[in-house]
Amino acid sequence: MKYEIYFDESNKLDQKTDNYSYYGALGASIQIIDKLNDNVSQINGSLNSKSELHFVNYTNDDKFIKYFEVISYVLNQDIKINIMIVDNNDAKEIAEKMNISIVELRELFYVKIPERLFYGLARNLNSNESIDIIIDENSEYEKINLMTKLEEQMNAHSVYRNKGYKVSSVKQKSSENEIPLQIIDTIMGIIVFLVERNFEEQSSKAKIIKSDLIYRLLIHNNNLEKLHNLVNLYKWNNKSEDITLLDLSKYTGSFIIMKAEYDIKEITRLSKIMAKYPNKVTKFYREKMKYSNRQLRQLKGYISELEDKGRNNF
C-alpha cells in the first residue's frame, strides 16, 4: 500500500516580524487521499468554485460553505497532521552560538524538522509500505537539495529503527494542483490563528470573519473532538533536546470562550435592532450592525440562531 505525506510551512525564521515559525505535515493512505481529492472536487463543482483553499485568503465569508464543508469532511477522515512551532528568538540564539546566519540555520531546520514531522506520521506504518512525500513549491528547497536529503534521512530512520517502510520519492508540486497541500495550509493556518490569539483583534474585519468560520466549524457535531484527535501540536525551543507536545485544547478552549462572549454581545445587539425594525431585508440589518458585505454569512448565522434554527442552518 502507498502512503503520502504533504508538507508546508508558515512564517519563516528570517522574517523578522514573526515570533514563531510553523511547519506542518499531513499523512494518509493513497486511498484516503484519492477520496479527499474526489470529495473536494465535488464540493468545488457544486459551488462552481475554482479558487484554492488558503486560510490567509479567507477574508470574505462568501466562501464560507466551501471552507466549512471541506474542513468538516477532512476532520472526519483517517488523516493525521503533525505541526511544529519554532520559537524564532530561541532559534536566533542558537544561530549566534554556532556563529552562523539565520538563513543557514533555517536550512538546517529544513532537514531536521520535516524529518521529525514525517517520522511521526510514518513510524506506525506496516513493513514494505511505500511513501511519497509532496512539498509545496519553493525555489529555496532546490538550492539546498532538500528532496534528496529528506529521502535519505527518512530511509535511514527506517533502517535504523527496523521499520521496513521506504520513501520512494520526494517531490515539489504546486498547491494549485494538489488539494492536500491546500488542506494542510488551511488547517495549519487555523492552528496558527488560535495559537497566536489573532481572534482577540476585534477591530479587524478579516480576523472577525476568520473567527466566525473557525467557531462554527468547532461547534458543529463533534468537530472539536475530531480536530484534537487529528492534529498533534509540538513546540521546539533551545532549552531542551526533546520537542514538547502541546495541549491543543488549551488554545481551542480559550478561543471558544472568547468567541462565545463576543457572539452573545452581537446577537443581543442584533435582537434589539430586529425588535425595533421587524421584517426587514438582510441588507437592512447588515447595515444597521455596521457589517461589511463580506460578513453576510456571519449575520445570517446570528439571524438563524435568533430563529432557533441553529448557527449552521444553511
Give residue spans per PLM region.
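Short helix/loop capping segments that flank catalytic or ligand/cofactor-binding pockets
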Residues: D14-K16, L36, K143-I144
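Short, flexible loop/turn elements at secondary-structure junctions
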Residues: E9-N11, G27-S29, E137-S139
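Two-metal-ion RNase H-like nuclease active-site motif
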Residues: K2-D14
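Short secondary-structure boundary/capping segments within folded domains
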Residues: L13-T17, I71-V74
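Compact, glycine/acidic-enriched structural inserts
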Residues: I32, L36-Y58
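Acidic, metal-ligating active-site segments
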Residues: K16-I33, I187
